[in-house]
């Protein structure tokens, strides 16, 4: 997979283009708060969240819309892992 193309759509939503298609990602203030990410880091949050998801499933299996609150609710380790990745990237 090549690096995803991340395009801000406004209102905390991003269009992510992958080799196997595209998906929209919604970054929520709660996930930002829980990861200690600044609002200016939203695109980086999207990139790292997608990397995390793609370690667990193929790009072809990603839904057309991803809400990071839903990922956090479905995967108890998501927010902690994302916070660690953000800290390592700084």
Label the model's feature ranges.
Residues 2-35, 72-89:
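N-terminal intrinsically disordered, cationic/polar leader segments
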Residues 35-43:
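Ordered, soluble secondary-structure elements with a strong preference for glycine-centered loop motifs
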Residues 42-87:
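Acidic, low-complexity intrinsically disordered segments
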């Amino acid at each position: 997979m090549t690096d995803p193309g991340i395009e801000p759509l406004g209102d905390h939503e991003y269009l992510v283009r992958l080799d196997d298609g595209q998906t929209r990602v919604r970054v929520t203030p709660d996930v930002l708060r829980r990861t200690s990410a600044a609002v200016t880091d939203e695109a980086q949050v999207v990139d790292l969240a997608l990397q995390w998801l793609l370690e667990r499933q193929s790009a072809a299996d990603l839904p057309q819309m991803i809400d990071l609150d839903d990922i956090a609710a479905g995967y108890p380790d998501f927010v902690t892992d994302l916070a660690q990745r953000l800290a390592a990237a700084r």
